[in-house]
Design a protein with these regions (language model features):
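Non-catalytic connector elements of ABC transporters
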Residues: 19-150
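Short acidic-hydrophobic catalytic motif
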Residues: 1-5, 13-16
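ABC ATPase "signature
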Residues: 5-9, 31
Length: 150
């Protein structure tokens, strides 16, 4: 479980887990000891990592597992507008495949099975900083500064 929750590289992050980790491309805006601020499209996302070794403006990837994304109304965190591309019902859960921007891959969101989302509907996604990962241009993970128990 340690590799799943604390991948040291993009390779490990994408290899372990099904559905796989979502990766969103962005640029580093700010790096402090306890967090980094990343621009993804028109959104600024806070990530609980130490990225001080990276240069401002560096190309980075923000990683988030499908079960660590909430749909609007489910709590705080950064909001990203998306549109539902496909819904896969699995019984007790559903997978929402959403598009968060023309330059981003389809993002997978795991929700409970009672989701009533409709194709093409607009959804606001909540990304909580403590569940996000940050990978540099070489695919190496930045050290997380807020560790949740696993």
């Amino acid at each position: 479980m340690n590799l799943y929750h604390r991948p040291a590289s993009l390779f490990v992050a994408e290899f372990i887990g099904s559905p796989k980790m979502n990766l969103l491309s962005g640029h580093l805006l700010r790096a402090e000891e306890n967090y980094a601020l990343v621009r993804i499209g028109g959104h600024e996302i806070s990530v609980a990592v130490d990225a001080r070794h990276l240069q401002m403006g560096a190309q980075v990837q923000v990683g988030v597992r499908p079960e660590h994304i909430a749909v609007a109304g489910s709590g705080g965190g950064a909001g990203i507008l998306s549109h539902l591309h496909h819904l896969e019902r699995l019984g007790d859960s559903s997978l929402l495949y959403v598009r968060v921007g023309v330059d981003q891959p389809i993002t997978t969101v795991k929700v409970d099975g009672s989701s009533q989302a409709l194709f093409g509907s607009a959804l606001t996604l909540r990304l909580l900083p403590e569940h996000l990962h940050l990978f540099d241009s070489q695919g190496m993970a930045c050290r997380r500064t807020l560790e949740l128990p696993i």
